[in-house]
């Protein structure tokens, strides 16, 4: 697979100012591409309110199911975004990966039950 997405913007994004209550980190984890950032972790301040819009697919992947379960709570401490596609048939193995990812990300706040 090529290291460059056809959807990649032609221009460089400007440096953005810090957003109070939000911390971002991105790494090249090898999820989808080699040598470029493909995993994002967002940490939100305690008490952050959230909402979401998810696929209407009748066959959503495990990450979408996870978010559907958590979104009604309306709060989040963290968000994990990868460059893969959530509308996939991953079955039980996908659910295990989502759960493990959330547990790893929960090191932000080990008592949190609000990591998307």
Kindly label every feature range from the protein language model:
Residues 1-7, 108, 112-116:
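Molybdopterin (Moco) oxidoreductase catalytic core of the xanthine/aldehyde oxidoreductase family
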Residues 36, 55-59, 76, 92-100:
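Conserved active-site and cofactor/substrate-binding residues in soluble primary-metabolism enzymes
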Residues 35-38, 59-61, 73-78, 110-114:
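Short coil/turn connectors at secondary-structure junctions
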Residues 1-55:
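N-terminal amphipathic/basic leader segments beginning at the initiator methionine
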Residues 19, 33, 76, 82, ...:
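Short glycine/serine/threonine-biased micro-segments
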Residues 18-19, 29-30, 53-56, 64-70, ...:
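Catalytic-core regions of core metabolic enzymes
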Residues 80-110:
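Alpha-helical support elements that line or immediately flank enzyme active sites
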Residues 42-76:
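Active-site-flanking structural segment that lines cofactor/substrate pockets
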